[in-house]
Amino acid sequence: IGIDVTHLAIALQKYRPKEMFPDADFVVIGEPTTIGAAQQLALDDRHQFEWWALSLIKARPVGAQSTGSKKGKKGADQGVDGVLTFIDDATNKPKRVLVQVKSGKVSSSQIRDLVGTVKREKAQMGVFITLEEPTGPMLKEAATAGFYESPGFNRAYPAIQIFTIKQLLEGKAVDMPAGNVTFKQAEKAKGDGPEQ
């Protein structure tokens, strides 16, 4: 399949076949699969790094439409690089997880800022993705943010979660309610083979 060269477009093209053909096995060539490759992408193009990092958790970049648009925006993001949306109660109203991506040095003040942004934007949770290892004070700051109590799943989720790129490459996932509606789902393929 020939696809666009942005990591935002690659992410969408990667999700769709997995949804349509859950048993199919395929490989995406050209996106980072190691920390070294991720560091190089961050040096080459910070925005592409952000979009790629967001794709690791299936978050929609800020500025991309909820209908699955491939267009993200560059520029002032008010402390938010991406969004995950989920539905976890009978109102069917989407709730938000705000995502911030950092490729440089990180500190506890960035976690405090994310906590403030989550409150200001009336989101339910926040995720901080970092290329560098988080500091002890960062982890402590995230822990003091408390929990989001999901009415539909009757359980608590950490309100602020920190992930390294290494953890995400190893398969670690955001601990959030299962009703993820960030991107429009592709229909599963029916029948024995592809149709035209």
Residue ranges, per PLM feature:
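Mixed-charge (Asp/Glu-Lys/Arg
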Residues: I1-Q196
